[in-house]
Design a protein with these regions (language model features):
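Residue-level recognition of the N-termini of beta-strands and the immediately preceding loop/turn
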Residues: 13-15, 128-132, 157-158, 188, ...
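Non-catalytic, mostly N-terminal accessory regions of nucleic-acid modification and defense proteins
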Residues: 1-53, 60
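Conserved S-adenosyl-L-methionine
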Residues: 51-168, 198-199, 205
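Short loop/turn motifs enriched for small/polar and acidic residues
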Residues: 20-22, 77, 163, 230
Length: 268
């Protein structure tokens, strides 16, 4: 009535207002982000039951891995774990490729966003040597992982290969990284989200994969393995002893455990 119009036309930036009510308390907030922060923006393609980017990053952070040390994901799926590792190794800000809802708001000067994004790009370390290897038996998974790595800007930092990881482990080829003999004196790191639940195949294939891991770890005692799974049998079937550490986590709504097997310190 004040403006003598029926409705206001939509114009300008979008302000996503969220209202929550708990008993007698009302909270009104503005969403400055847009899509959830666990979405880095690089995952354009995925396979069944992909692991969240934030969970993959946490798995890498809780391991012994650092830039320059060999990291292998033998069940890489759409590549989330190796991609997150590569981004951490390059010191890339998690949301470096994202655009946020508040960037269109007049209250925040565009120059501030530009300056912060510039600082984030300047902080990227392109010189650290990265030895990251990702395998999967599924051709479509490898193709998706390679596309996602390219979108994240780390395509050249990860060596992807379609392969049967059980066979690689049993043949010892996980340590024979390439023709130049790219090995790690400290012992490599396996970080993986093996098949289970929606991702599980037939029991025989899973048993064969576990047997491959078990054989590889026996033959390479300085290697460490970090695996997330709801399958409590992994301690017996892979490690043949209790894990050095366990952490209860959630992969989506599924309760899982992050099993940490620490390899022996290499002899001087």
């Amino acid at each position: 009535e004040t403006y003598a119009i029926d409705r206001f036309e939509k114009s300008g930036a979008l302000y996503d207002i969220k209202i929550t009510i708990l008993k007698d308390r009302v909270t009104v907030t503005l969403d400055t982000t847009g899509p959830s922060l666990h979405k880095r923006g690089y995952r354009q393609n995925s396979v069944a039951a992909p692991i969240k980017e934030t969970l993959a990053a946490a798995m890498v952070s809780l391991s012994f891995w650092k830039a320059g040390r060999v990291l292998v994901d033998p069940c890489c799926g759409s590549g989330t774990i190796p991609i997150e590792a590569a981004m951490m190794g390059r010191n890339m800000a998690p949301g470096i490729g994202c655009r946020f809802a508040a960037e269109d708001w007049e209250a925040i000067a565009p120059s501030l966003w530009k300056e912060e994004r510039k600082r984030a790009f300047e902080a990227v370390d392109w010189d650290s040597p990265l030895k990251i290897y990702a395998y999967d038996i599924d051709k479509k998974a490898i193709e998706a992982a390679m596309e996602n790595a390219a979108e994240a800007g780390v395509a050249d930092d990860i060596r992807f290969c379609r392969a049967d990881s059980a066979k690689l482990c049993l043949s010892g080829q996980l340590t024979d990284m390439n023709k130049s003999g790219d090995k790690d004196k400290e012992g490599g790191i396996i970080i993986t989200n093996p098949p289970y639940g929606e991702r599980i195949g037939d029991k025989e294939s899973i048993d064969r994969l576990y047997a491959g891991f078990r054989t590889f770890l026996k033959e390479n005692p300085t290697w460490s393995m970090f695996a997330i799974t709801p399958d409590k049998a992994v301690e017996e079937l892979i490690f043949e002893r209790p894990a050095d550490r366990r952490r209860k986590l959630f992969n989506g709504r599924l309760e899982v455990c992050y099993y940490q097997y620490h390899g022996q310190k290499p002899k001087e």
